Amino acid sequence: MDSTVFINNPSLTLPFSYTFTSSSNSSTTTSTTTDSSSGQWMDGRIWSKLPPPLLDRVIAFLPPPAFFRTRCVCKRFYSLLFSNTFLETYLQLLPLRHNCFLFFKHKTLKSYIYKRGGTNDDDSNKAEGFLFDPNEIRWYRLSFAYIPSGFYPSGSSGGLVSWVSEEAGLKTILLCNPLVGSVSQLPPISRPRLFPSIGLSVTPTSIDVTVAGDDLISPYAVKNLSSESFHVDAGGFFSLWAMTSSLPRLCSLESGKMVYVQGKFYCMNYSPFSVLSYEVTGNRWIKIQAPMRRFLRSPSLLESKGRLILVAAVEKSKLNVPKSLRLWSLQQDNATWVEIERMPQPLYTQFAAEEGGKGFECVGNQEFVMIVLRGTSLQLLFDIVRKSWLWVPPCPYSGSGGGSSGGGSDGEVLQGFAYDPVLTTPVVSLLDQLTLPFPGVC
C-alpha cells in the first residue's frame, strides 16, 4: 500500500513507539521511548523478551496502513503477511473493521463502444484504485496491475473486489484481494449479457453473487429479463449460476450497482424511480416504491449498519418546498421509508452551486456516506452518527483538475465502493475446486 497521504503527511514512525508523562520537581516533562545513550527507539531489555506470539497479537490489531508500515521494521515483520500462523491468529481475533472507500476512474456505460472480438483500448485508468480512509481523512493509492486488461470493477465485499469482463457475452468475474494481490476466478455466467447489475456478498465462510438484467436477446438488442445467482460456502454447498426468478416487468436497472443488506440485494429501478429487491433464500424479486419518487434526482442506494439507505436530491419545482438532499431508511417491513437526515440548507446551497445539475454518486460504509460530485474533484463526507458534514480534500492521485477526477472528461466518473481491507480471505480457496486459473493471472 502506498503510504503517501494528501494531508498531514507525517514522517514514518515505528508502530510501537510511544510517549509517557512523568513529574519531577513539580514540572512535567514528556519523554519518548528513544534511549539517548544508545539511540534506539525502544528498550531492548524489555521488547526483546516479549514473546513473539504476544507481539503478533498486538500487530494483528493494527489498522491496515499501520500494519504495512510495520512491515518496514524488520524481516520477521515483513514476512507476517505470508505466515500461516500469524494469519490464523488474525482471523481468530477478528480485529475491528477498518471502514474505507475504494474509488476507480471508470468510463460511463454510454462511452463504451462494443466491438465484436475487442474491448475498450484505454486501460490506463483501471490499473490503480484510490483508497480513502474516512477516519483519518487520508488518501492512498492501490495498484491493480495484476488485473488483466478488458475488466472493470463492479463491487466489493469482505475485503474482496470484483472485476467483470467488458466484452458482451458470457461474463467472467474475478475476485481479488488488493492488499496481497491475489486473484480468483468464478465460472462464467450461464447467459450472455451486456452490462448487467452485479451484487456481491462475501463472508468468512461463503460467497454469493447475483447478476441481473441486460440479457442479450440478439447481437444488437438487450432486455432486462432474468437474473442468475452463484453460491459457495464452507459447508460444501455450492450452486453454479442457477437461474433465479424473472425480473419484474418493465424494469429499468442502473447497470452495475447492487447493495447487499441482511440477506437481500437491492438496486435502483428507473422510469419511474423505485427499488428492486432480490431475496436470496426466497429466490424472489419484489418492487418497492421509492419515497417522493416523482421529485428525486440522482438517487443512490447504500448500506449503513445493517440498514438500506436511499440518498437523493429532492426538487419540487411547482411546490413551495425548498430543494434539498435527503436520506431515507427502509424499515423492516420492506415497504416503508423514514427520513433520517436532511442536508442543512446553507450547505445544500453551496453543494448545488458546485454540483451544477451534473448529478452526483453516493456510497456508504457503516456510519459514513461519501458523496462524489460528477465533473468535479469534490467529495462530501457525512457522518451519520455525529451528524457532521465535511468537504474532503481532493484525491491527489486521480489526475489534475476537476474534470478527470470527478468525471466529465472522456465520459469518466469516479466510481466508489464500500471497502473493508483485510489481510487474508481464505474463503476464496473454495473457488479453487470449481475453476481453472484465469489466463494471465498469477
Swiss-Prot record:
InterPro entries: F-box-like_dom_sf, F-box_dom, Kelch-typ_b-propeller, KIB1-4_b-propeller, SCF_F-box_component. Pathway: Protein modification; protein ubiquitination. GO terms for biological process: cell differentiation; flower development; meristem structural organization; protein ubiquitination; regulation of DNA-templated transcription; SCF-dependent proteasomal ubiquitin-dependent protein catabolic process. Residues 1-85 are annotated as: Interaction with SKP1A. Its main location: nucleus. SUPFAM superfamilies: F-box domain, Kelch motif. PROSITE patterns: FBOX. Signal peptide: none annotated. Part of a putative SCF (ASK/Cullin/F-box) ubiquitin ligase complex. Interacts with SKP1A/ASK1, SKP1B/ASK2 and ASK11. The F-box is necessary for the interaction with ASK proteins. Mutations in the UFO gene result in the formation of unusual floral organs. Component of SCF(ASK-cullin-F-box) E3 ubiquitin ligase complexes, which may mediate the ubiquitination and subsequent proteasomal degradation of target proteins. Considered as a meristem identity factor required for normal growth of the young floral meristem. Acts together with LEAFY to positively regulate the B class floral homeotic genes APETALA3 and PISTILLATA. In this way, operates as a region-specific regulator for petal and stamen development. Alternatively, may play a role as a negative regulator of the C class floral homeotic genes. This is Protein UNUSUAL FLORAL ORGANS. It comes from Arabidopsis thaliana (Mouse-ear cress). The gene is UFO.
